[in-house]
């Protein structure tokens, strides 16, 4: 049984090149397509998994491979001044200007908020416009392209310590903030990796940096140019599928916002485009739709994620 099957996703067709494996991350091949889709659309991504599962490593490698200015913030420790620098009044005292520090966000092209589920609520509110609007203090961040975050699974209200690791300091995000992440990706743990993936992980030998840089940039560009073609191809089918899926989730007490309905449509088109780039014509639309529901529901980031059975049942009925 593959890692993808254990996590509820259909196994991907064989690809000539795996993004995550080239970056030195094993066992994430089933996440290649949503990662590529997010990079091509510059959509925010939330990675959810236990400590030590390569969440931070992957993001740092992506930033390096794409040659982007990456700002890595530990959201559990951050202060607002760490983002914006030092505020000083301008002459006359009517306006503030920000004196940048080496870690401030102003020239960032890729922002990563680690441990976002341990962040104080007031700072989560300040991260909200960065993630959703690419703004801070009301000012547009012109260079910013990618906004990613990572967290440990939130601790359920009632838990059994014998069931595994519980992260008592990790709390569910505010629903409005969670709803701003088009892709919410659970990452595999050690026991979900196949033996060969485990062996490769122990050695961890990523591809040559220059090879990855050229290949990844090319894949992102081709995926971005393929998305409009997919949108045109799915124009008549997609609205009915998304409306049916959202209604079925509502019946299952998994309520989705109108914004999320639009996000699901956009995510499906970009994810199918990514799978066409990675796997060619073998990438079936049926599987792309299934993956969209598995990897683009905000409830995946809550204390009690929806069951695989529920999500796949909605997909089949829609």
Language model regions located:
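Switch/coupling segment of Walker-type NTPase motor domains
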Residues: 77
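Residue-level recognition of beta-strand->loop/alpha-helix junctions
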Residues: 72-74
């Amino acid at each position: 049984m593959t890692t993808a099957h254990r996590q509820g996703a259909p196994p991907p067709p064989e690809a000539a090149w795996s993004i995550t494996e080239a970056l030195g991350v094993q066992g994430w091949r089933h996440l290649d397509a949503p990662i590529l889709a997010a990079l091509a659309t510059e959509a925010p991504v939330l990675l959810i998994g236990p400590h030590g599962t390569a969440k931070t490593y992957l993001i740092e490698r992506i930033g390096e491979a794409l040659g982007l200015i990456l700002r890595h913030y530990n959201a559990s420790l951050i202060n607002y001044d760490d983002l914006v620098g030092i505020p000083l009044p301008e002459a006359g005292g009517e306006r503030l200007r920000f004196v940048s520090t080496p870690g401030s966000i102003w020239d960032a092209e890729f922002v990563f908020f680690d441990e976002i589920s341990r962040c104080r609520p007031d700072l989560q509110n300040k991260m909200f416009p960065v993630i959703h609007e690419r703004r801070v203090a009301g000012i547009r961040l012109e260079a910013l392209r990618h906004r990613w975050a990572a967290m440990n699974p939130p601790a359920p209200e009632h838990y059994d310590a014998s069931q595994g690791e519980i992260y008592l300091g990790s709390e569910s995000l505010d629903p409005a903030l969670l709803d701003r992440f088009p892709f919410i990706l659970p990452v595999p743990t050690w026991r979900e990796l196949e033996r060969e993936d485990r062996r490769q992980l122990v050695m961890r030998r990523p591809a040559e940096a220059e090879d990855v840089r050229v290949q990844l940039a090319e894949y992102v560009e081709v995926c971005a140019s393929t998305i409009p073609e997919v949108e045109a191809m799915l124009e008549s089918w997609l609205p009915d599928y998304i409306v049916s899926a959202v209604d079925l989730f509502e019946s299952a007490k998994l309520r989705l916002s109108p914004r999320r309905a639009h996000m699901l449509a956009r995510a499906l088109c970009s994810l199918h485009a990514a799978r066409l780039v990675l796997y060619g014509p073998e990438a079936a639309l049926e599987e792309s739709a299934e993956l969209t529901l598995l990897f683009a529901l905000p409830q995946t980031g809550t204390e009690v994620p929806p069951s695989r059975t529920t999500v796949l049942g909605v997909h089949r009925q829609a």
